[in-house]
């Protein structure tokens, strides 16, 4: 699956966290998303994939070639999105080859994304942009990270001649409310370095 397709699929799923909830994860919507990620990871061929009782998802990509003795590496990303703005329903789309002008996000509500308001947009002229209809968050933080990590893992699995050390993946709930590592099981992340 291409990273763009994966990202659009992920942002369409509501995983907004709730800082007022005493539960962990703070919202029940994060668990089905975690289960879906675990199924994808198993289907692509990652080993030791598990969604634990607190909603964390772990998976492993064994070392290849002469890299078996290399130190382990881990990649982490969080599944929840910010509770600070509406997060559903996300109506994401791609603006192809952005022309540098205003982007009409929502014709009914006359919502625009304008370089006059956000001058940084000018840096992205000619590139493809992911946007919403302006009524919700996109969810790029951190579903873009999940999409990138899983797409890279899938690529390495499909190209086993590329040498790499052992890689662990971990996806966490509730980072946006400051509880992302409250129940993480570090024994499942045998890595010298994590990003």
Task: Locate predicted features.
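Acidic/His- and Gly-rich active-site-bordering loop/insert found
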Residues: 1-129
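Acidic/histidine-rich catalytic neighborhood of metal-dependent amide-processing enzymes
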Residues: 122-195
């Amino acid at each position: 699956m291409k990273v763009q397709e994966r990202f659009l699929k992920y942002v369409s799923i509501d995983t907004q966290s709730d800082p007022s909830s005493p539960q962990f994860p703070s919202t029940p919507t994060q668990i089905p998303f975690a289960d879906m990620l675990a199924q994808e990871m198993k289907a692509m061929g990652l080993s030791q994939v598990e969604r634990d009782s607190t909603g964390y998802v772990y998976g492993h990509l064994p070392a290849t070639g002469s890299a078996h003795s290399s130190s382990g590496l881990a990649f982490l990303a969080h599944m929840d999105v910010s509770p600070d703005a509406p997060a559903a329903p996300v109506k994401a789309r791609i603006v192809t080859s952005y022309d540098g002008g205003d982007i009409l996000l929502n014709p009914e509500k006359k919502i625009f994304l304008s370089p006059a308001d956000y001058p940084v947009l000018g840096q992205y002229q000619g590139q493809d942009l992911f946007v919403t209809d302006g009524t919700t968050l996109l969810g790029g933080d951190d579903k873009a990270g999940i999409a990138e990590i899983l797409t890279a893992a899938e690529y390495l699995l499909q190209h086993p001649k590329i040498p790499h050390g052992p890689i662990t993946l971990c996806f966490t709930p509730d980072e946006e409310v400051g509880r992302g590592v409250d129940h993480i099981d570090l024994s499942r992340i045998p890595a010298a370095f994590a990003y």
